[in-house]
Amino acid sequence: MLTLVRQSLVVTLLLAALLCGAYPVLVTGAAQALLPGKANGSPVMVDGRVTGSDLIGQHFTGAGYFHGRPSAAGEDGYDASASGGSNLGPTSRTLAEAMQARADALRAENPDWKAPLPPDMVTASASGLDPHVSPQGAAMQVARVAAARGLPIKSVARLVEEHVEGPQLGLFGEPHVNVLRLNLALDALAGGRAEGN
């Protein structure tokens, strides 16, 4: 009996040392060596300081910035500590009302957009922190952003086109635009930040 207890303790301690110590150190070291930016959360640096992440959406509200997808993460959205969707089903009246309110707000913000609204601009992502919008979601905002920044519409539209990323490995997913990267490029094009965030 004592032998079994000792063997169990030895195995437990060895596995704890291996799985709680050696394995995490090895994986972290390999990630830092092979993919240092991605291993640290894909930070986006501006003037030597972290401004955001390529992987986590931010809430932009100013008329001079492109806005991301709606977020259901946390009470006010975009709360990384409360990542998650609304969990509302397709028959939910609450979801239908939220989508209608978002659609009305989008039409009010972007009155020049006459095409149907892109679905990603009225629906929250599963994580609530999606950093991307569809190319159509960015295109619908071009006139508003250009007017707020005093830029030619063609220049802003070209900037959107330059920031469209294709599917991963050419097969997985849809074309998309990283909103943070697009807004930083917009700041560079316009020569500074706009009012709002």
Curated annotation (Swiss-Prot):
Membrane topology term: Single-pass membrane protein
Record-linked InterPro entries: KdpC
Intracellular or extracellular location(s): Cell inner membrane
One protein family per Pfam: KdpC
Signal sequence segment: none
Sequence intervals crossing the membrane: 9-29
Keywords: ATP-binding, Cell inner membrane, Cell membrane, Ion transport, Membrane, Nucleotide-binding, Potassium, Potassium transport, Transmembrane, Transmembrane helix, Transport
Top-level taxonomic group: Bacteria
Disulphide bonds in the chain: none
GO annotations of cellular component type: plasma membrane
Main function: Part of the high-affinity ATP-driven potassium transport (or Kdp) system, which catalyzes the hydrolysis of ATP coupled with the electrogenic transport of potassium into the cytoplasm. This subunit acts as a catalytic chaperone that increases the ATP-binding affinity of the ATP-hydrolyzing subunit KdpB by the formation of a transient KdpB/KdpC/ATP ternary complex.
Family stated for the protein in its record: Belongs to the KdpC family.
Protein name per its UniProtKB record: Potassium-transporting ATPase KdpC subunit
Source taxonomy: Bacteria, Pseudomonadati, Thermodesulfobacteriota, Desulfovibrionia, Desulfovibrionales
Recorded name of the encoding gene: kdpC
